[in-house]
Amino acid sequence: IYYGTKYKDDSAAVRIDRNFDRDRFVSFSFNYTNNWDGYPVVPRDYRYADRFFSGQVNIDSAAGKKHGPINPGFRNKWWYHGVLGDYTTSITRNLDVTWQFKKDHDLPSYVRIFRTRNDYSDAWIKNYTYPNYTPSGNVTPAQIQDWLKTYTGGFSVSSYQERSNGLDFQFGKNIGINNILFGMTVSHDYYRRVNPSARTRASISRNMFTSYLQDKLKIGDNFEITPGLRYIHSDDYTVKNGGGKDISPSDSSVSHLSGMLSTRYKLDDTLSLYASWAQVFRAKRVTDYDATLEPLDDEKGNVYNIGLKKKIGSRTSLDINFSYLKMDNAIGAYSVEDASTATGTKSYAMNASQSKRALNIGIDHRFNENWRLGISYSYVKTHYHAKHFTTVPDGSGTSLDDLLSKQIPMNSYQFDLGYDKGKFSADFLTSIYSGNDENFFTNKRFVVSDLTLNFKITDSTSVYLVGNNLWNTAWENRYYYHMGKGAFPQPGRRFLIGIN
């Protein structure tokens, strides 16, 4: 039995629009979600279930816990947390009000006020006196359930709060061949974390200002070029630790100007070319300062894109696109086991150079008024190079560069066959993921098919049937070093019937 896998999701959304004329309106929206999720977060590894319950899988940090690749069955610890009744929650409350006061040649001008509230919590049972946290002897789930009936120790709840209040402004103006957009955003961001079991807490806040200016120049009927600038400024972070002392990291204040340029040229009615370049810059967020024990650098680099669109006859179209991303610094946190810490893990700052090449080819063809087919191919090649260390610092000798660069399928193919007739429509989509490194995936390739059927009863009502993963393929598109291969499978075969 998968104890602890229950979940509950509640949500509500309200939107009110008041249109004054074709170009002016006021819009109010509020979104609310409340999610409660039990464990486990990964499926059981049945190969090592007996090993886990006989106490051979060490998940206790005090005794030097190890993860999946060098401690088979480690991910079963999350099933154990499900048995104990641990859970996570998330609540979001997002509000915004938008006033569009002008629209000039499809260039909107508006003011938007927003407020976001995100609250997260992790609840862990406080007292692991039975079966002493690490299963030993021949512990059974039933024995643990019996013990829980008499447990009165409660849960240790860690909480995380994210807040952002701000204002967006955009002004659009057409002047001859110039289509100008100017915008800016001011916000105050706040993050708070409380971990009672580790007796730590932190509050981090920051003021941010971003602005952009772009001009789409239409030169004749066939050529357009769009230069643009983006400016970002953020104040020093104010970090308040558990003792109440305020700290402003000396490198946290940021001012940066970046540029972009895009162009499109129409050779004739059937062929057009396009290209773009943009500088990438992302300043450290409030959560970046709290997520790692090591310093992170701002993220920066360049992205280039080139492509063509071609009509072949009256029924076929071709789209080819190539992009290249070159990051001088890509940031992130990388967590590994460290028995010397209270939690048994340590987060390392992952400042790395990154290059990413992607090729996308798509062909759409309509056979007649009823049948159509879309075929696409995507190739992605990513290479990370960590700057501060080359192997995972856990003694396993694993290459960090390989680990980061080979965690997604390299090739993907999609075949989308569609049928439309009167009130009935159908789509049969098959996706093939290949080029998977079997050090990180359970198979070199995965084939997944989905089917969608739709029938329109009236102009406002339709019924539908959706079938996902028709072949019930066991597949995954993610790898996480802690848990080992196959720890994040995608959903199996399922069907959904509904009315719109």
Where are these regions (language model features)?
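Conserved C-terminal beta-signal and adjacent last beta-strands/turns
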Residues: 17-21, 33, 215, 275, ...
